[in-house]
Amino acid sequence: MSDVWGYTDETGIEYAIVGYQNGTSIINISEESPIEAGNIIGPSTGDYYFHRDYKTYGDFLYIVNEMYGGDIGMQVIDLSPLPHSPPIQLQTYNYIGQSHNLWIDPSGYAFIEHQSGDNIHIADLSNPSSPTYYGTFGTQAQNCHDIFTQDNIAYVSEGWSNQFGIYDISNLNNITQLAIIPCQGYAHNAWTNTDGNILVTTEETDGMTIKIWDIEDFDNINLIGEYLGENNLAHNVHIKENFIYISHYTTGIKIIDIFNPTYPVEVAAYDTYLENDLGGFFGCWGAYPFTENGYIYASDMQYGLYVLDFNEVNAGWVNGHIYFNNTIPFENTSIRSILNNKVYYTNNNGSFDIGFPSGNHMFIVNEQDTIQINFLPHQITTQDIFIGNELIPGDINQDTLIDILDVIIIINIVLNNYEPSNQEFWVSDMNFDGIINIQDIILIVQLILDN
């Protein structure tokens, strides 16, 4: 399967719209067992991925594709016969050929990525059953791969131009550039929040993060947050309320809370691709979160359509310090989540800053001590944590024994071959004079001999 979209008919029945090799399947998902309510045949010759993209406008579905053979162009489908009769293809708008992506603005214009002509093609949907040619972006927004519009602003992902373009489309006869955001990868897809002050972008390039931009001022755009899943390759993002919904290829679908956009937090995930979490263009292609019943549709290229239920979980953020023996900062040490095995670290003064799904969660510090941290929904709180048994002077490696291993460590400290942590310094300073030297070595050796 390729991309996925959704539609709700006049009776409230909801449908998933998904692409496959020979066309488009329209699936009634309101039943316990989803059933196909319509099948639209389309061009079927092309590459392995069967690129198809969908948007709806009222009771009409518009389909573009990158395939060959058959009637090439934008298919116009009347969905109003549902649920009693199958949808009907009215025509193919053939002012364009192959296309990877389209977007329909609420004002009634379709913006279509045009692979073989005018780049971004604009169609007028005043009569939605019979689109007419309106115009283009001209020489602007070249190499368009994806387009999204909101509030008379177009956000164009400009592919191998390595940039995301922002354009004023309030006058379609005089489209003007407002800003450019350069990127190092392939500018693949972009989406804004409802307020239009946050833009999230993907680059569909191995190792390139999903980026969160503050676009409150187009003259002063700033990168404020980043995220990337385990496979290091993301496909597309959509935003609904405070959540980013990511089709993340082999790791499936990811849901990220951006209530605090400077610290995005993964709050839910579902692995649609069962083979592995390695890189590569396999797995989850599309994610559609805009259903009325709260379900999420996910299309997986190998495993088909998933209908998922998200019991909304908000993120919380906790910062503080971890102390050993009540006063000594536990510096540069691991804090591993028992829930998902993710590892965080304290810095060199023992402080930590963790974002996590809300609730009480258990962590293991330094692979030794189990602690509990309480994350409150959409709140930033402070929690200092005190762990461990009392530190024993001379037990530098903290194995509860004072032996030759500790002598080796303190000798290396004195010779400046090893930089001790706060804990190690405290237990090495045997005479508590604030200096580690030969006197401390002698005192540790004396302890060993006495024992």
Q: PLM features: what roles do these ranges have?
A:
Residues 329-330, 337-357, 373:
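Short, acidic Ser/Thr/Gly-rich low-complexity loop/linker segments typical of extracellular
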Residues 1-326, 344:
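Feature marking well-ordered beta-strand scaffolds used for ligand recognition
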Residues 318-334, 397-401:
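Structural motif
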Residues 358-369:
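A short, solvent-exposed beta-strand micro-motif common in secreted/extracellular proteins
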Residues 332-333, 398-422, 432-451:
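Alpha-helical segments with a strong preference for the paired helices of cellulosomal dockerin domains
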Residues 124, 168, 257, 391-401, ...:
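Acidic, divalent-cation-chelating loop motifs in proteins
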